[in-house]
Curated annotation (Swiss-Prot):
Protein name: Alkaline/neutral invertase E, chloroplastic
Keyword Transcription: no
Gene Ontology, cellular component aspect: chloroplast
Native species: Arabidopsis thaliana (Mouse-ear cress)
Modification Phosphoserine occurs at: 87
Xref: SUPFAM superfamilies: Six-hairpin glycosidases
Presence of keyword Hydrolase: yes
Amino acid sequence: MAASETVLRVPLGSVSQSCYLASFFVNSTPNLSFKPVSRNRKTVRCTNSHEVSSVPKHSFHSSNSVLKGKKFVSTICKCQKHDVEESIRSTLLPSDGLSSELKSDLDEMPLPVNGSVSSNGNAQSVGTKSIEDEAWDLLRQSVVFYCGSPIGTIAANDPNSTSVLNYDQVFIRDFIPSGIAFLLKGEYDIVRNFILYTLQLQSWEKTMDCHSPGQGLMPCSFKVKTVPLDGDDSMTEEVLDPDFGEAAIGRVAPVDSGLWWIILLRAYGKCTGDLSVQERVDVQTGIKMILKLCLADGFDMFPTLLVTDGSCMIDRRMGIHGHPLEIQALFYSALVCAREMLTPEDGSADLIRALNNRLVALNFHIREYYWLDLKKINEIYRYQTEEYSYDAVNKFNIYPDQIPSWLVDFMPNRGGYLIGNLQPAHMDFRFFTLGNLWSIVSSLASNDQSHAILDFIEAKWAELVADMPLKICYPAMEGEEWRIITGSDPKNTPWSYHNGGAWPTLLWQLTVASIKMGRPEIAEKAVELAERRISLDKWPEYYDTKRARFIGKQARLYQTWSIAGYLVAKLLLANPAAAKFLTSEEDSDLRNAFSCMLSANPRRTRGPKKAQQPFIV
């Protein structure tokens, strides 16, 4: 086993094959006893009694368990998985994708309103209430249990899929909307367990090809496995098996996992009022380890976080390596959340000072250099290049010819957005939805910029939302650009998956941003649009074509974060005040520091620099 594995030992002969472990709906936390087994291994015993339970009807199936009424019955001891009895019908694209001509023709086909076309051509209608009920049932079916307690939700529960890959695992980023949905519903245990168990995984040894990344790295995903106990066939052990990118397609590093973990931790405290979790010594240490990894000194001259391609929601090669907006927005949000939660102590003074300095610099950098509107495009169009000066206007030596032809006519007179990436001599002018929305939520964007982003989305509704919210980025790369940048990725063909596909899970971020800015009608319109199809389409992972007419050619059905994203949007629209659990407001200290930077001489301070003290974690 890997180092520091977390184990539950269950004697096979001591209980029947169907063991009542825990109830998901009862606020109960298992009693766990820690017993060191070896230097790099730790055992977790569940001391709750195991008893056979009589169960009522109405069972829900998941990948390794059955939820019956309000009781959970484990089927792990049988080494079996339940087959889903209901056959699912779906409309999928050919595996080789669609030609551009066919996509254009299909985009002109009308879609039914308030329903989807069935096999006999008749429209089927599903009420809003029934959609929510179905979504909650599906979300609870996706719950994964460990030590008798809910610990997360699997990525997808698609019974039609012939290849599971890693969709049966609990992904950190995928669980965020699920966790928020449970928090807003008043079901807190699953989020608390998720936070604490993933924290244990942070300290695991992570090695790929003899190289180990930083200690604070959070896993991309994990899976609950049941294996025979070494040396004792009469015992089994439940093992948390994490993936830090060693097994992921492309071996991508999950940079966003730790950032999302901090954001969820803060949301848990805000929503429950229980600050005891974030004040725990091990949780405080986990926060500091993530910050230490993110704030480490490097060669970069920018305050933004330098990452490789595929390090966030867009986890395939899409030309976002460098300083992608999504990572910067999550980074800023995590810094703000950590600033609230870190307990004051002597050992944290230097870390908090570095955190505050980075917040101010990052805020200034994104607002000044990532912002794009019609005025800024005209400014770039007139840029002088090859400027060698401390007060150069074109600091990053951006060539005006980089302005893409589509952008000139696409940018509305009113509104703007934050570009996708910025590096020396390179600006990625694509609109990335998650990065822009989370910049609003976290106050990385200014108040005026936040309203302008929403103005932009409204002005370009037909392109960014079309028939199913919400495009992950716009526009899609096509032709030679697609071949060079994606490496001819067959999954990221134009207007599919990460390359301009529509992702329903983004509904919840749009809702939080809209409510924060006092414009909930934007989210209401998007949710109403999604309700026309998403249930009858079996909750797909993403949609294809320019107007999102088809279920994605490789999209999983019953994708958990599509389900959870819809539920969070509905819960927040029903109770807009709850959005404050997720948003951050710019405080006066940061605002004053930002104003000072704007008015200061752009020439950098020169001279010897005082040595910084290392962070002690």
